[in-house]
Design a protein with these regions (language model features):
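A beta-strand edge to alpha-helix "cap/lid" segment located at domain peripheries
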Residues: 122, 127-128
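Conserved catalytic-core motifs of GNAT/GCN5-like acyltransferases
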Residues: 82, 130-132, 150-167
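Conserved hydrophobic/aromatic "anchor" residues
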Residues: 15, 119-121, 149
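Positions that flank functional sites
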Residues: 42, 136, 159
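Active-site acidic-Proline motif in GNAT/NAT acetyltransferases
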Residues: 97-102, 106, 122, 135-136
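GNAT-family acyltransferases
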Residues: 1-102, 165-198
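Conserved acetyl-CoA-binding loop-helix of GNAT-fold acetyltransferases
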Residues: 105-119, 138-146
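Amphipathic alpha-helical recognition patches that constitute DNA-binding helices
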Residues: 11, 22, 41, 94, ...
Length: 198
């Protein structure tokens, strides 16, 4: 399974054992990515998920994990999980991204998040996709805005990292926003969002 958008330099696809090797060789550390570091990874955990098939989402699932590929190689991953608001089972898809250090700062993260937003709206029934990031992570906030998500506010003290609770900037896009952006785009170039206005 692969998923991309016309003109995008990245694609999303299922994990392979080779991808596990790449990611195991490039773990998040306090020095390389303090916003994604939550301690040492469990050795072999991703390999076990790939071998069991657990790492391969099916269309329609509101949880999953896919590789981000650019120029034919694994450069990171995207993941998503359901987030319910209230007692009705009508979840939002909350997503995140992790890129290896050599892939950062090249626009791949923004492109991967655009592709993922499109994938989630095209393959699930969610009415909303969202992502949050540390209020100090300015690069990811810009990336989410470029991917078409709108900043909705700050969720105070929601994220435990580096021995303390941190504030998170919350971004989201609803299905009506997404469909309006698609309708406004040309027939030959499909985009997943629009620049957030301030």
């Amino acid at each position: 399974m692969t998923y991309t958008l016309p003109g995008s330099p990245v694609l999303l696809r299922h994990f392979t054992l080779d991808d596990c090797t790449v990611l195991e060789a490039n773990p998040a550390t306090m020095d390389s990515d303090r916003f994604s570091f939550f301690g040492l990874p469990v050795p072999g955990r991703m390999r076990r998920r790939v071998e069991s098939g657990e790492a391969h989402p099916k269309p329609g699932e509101v949880h999953g994990l896919l590789v981000v590929e650019a120029e034919g190689v694994c450069i990171g991953f995207v993941s998503w999980h359901p987030q319910n608001y209230g007692p009705i089972n009508a979840p939002t898809a909350n997503f995140g991204i992790g890129l290896i250090p050599s892939a950062r700062g090249k626009g791949y993260g923004t492109e991967a998040q655009k592709v993922l937003v499109d994938y989630l709206f095209q393959t699930t029934t969610v009415n909303r996709v969202e992502a949050s990031t540390d209020v100090e992570n300015i690069a990811e906030q810009r990336s989410l805005e470029k991917a078409g998500l709108l900043r909705e506010g700050v969720v105070r003290g929601a994220h435990y990292r580096e021995g303390r609770y941190n504030d998170m900037a919350l971004y989201a896009l609803t299905r009506p926003d997404y469909e309006q952006a698609r309708a406004a785009s040309s027939a030959t170039k499909i985009t997943t969002g629009f620049s957030a206005s301030r």
